[in-house]
Amino acid sequence: MNYCSSCLNVDTRPNSNFPKKNLCSACDYYFKTKNVNYEERIIILNNIVKKFPKNPKRRYDCIIGVSGGKDSTRQALWIRDKLNLRPLLVCLGYPPEKSNNIGPHNLSNLINLGFDVHCIYYSPKQWKDLARYCFRNFGNYLRHSEQAIVSAVPRLAIKYKIPVIFWGENPGDVLGDSKTQGKTGYDGNNVKF
């Protein structure tokens, strides 16, 4: 068993790895981003946003995939209030087996804050059929819901002609799960089926 030299996390945690100098991937990410010039990144982000001027014929300027977690609320507020964009929020409604009361409460809060939230739900039968299929074929009965949110956001962006998509953080970098890491961050490279 190996330990992270910074946080003492162990390599026996599922999907963990220690890419550099006995650091877990979460600590490695922390040290990589410690000296990031966020003021420069804000300028870059603002320049990207300027490439997609507001269009009065379009109801939304951007789209954000949200889960109902605290990060979703922060991200939506920041994009609306700091970047002055009109976002459409997209959420995959999870079945009772995978949700608690906090997510729906936070989504209600987003609606009360003036956001439009597009929720996508499976029928109970469809959810069970997909869960069974994913368990048998991938060993992960929730894989269908993980892939659904990654595909739903771009599909709705195309459908409603929304030019900008905002994604949240990469859980592999932030939480240390190497199975979710893509080539350039959380870019969908692990979505294979």
Please describe what each predicted stretch is.
Residues 2-193:
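ATP-dependent adenylation/nucleotidyltransferase module used to activate substrates
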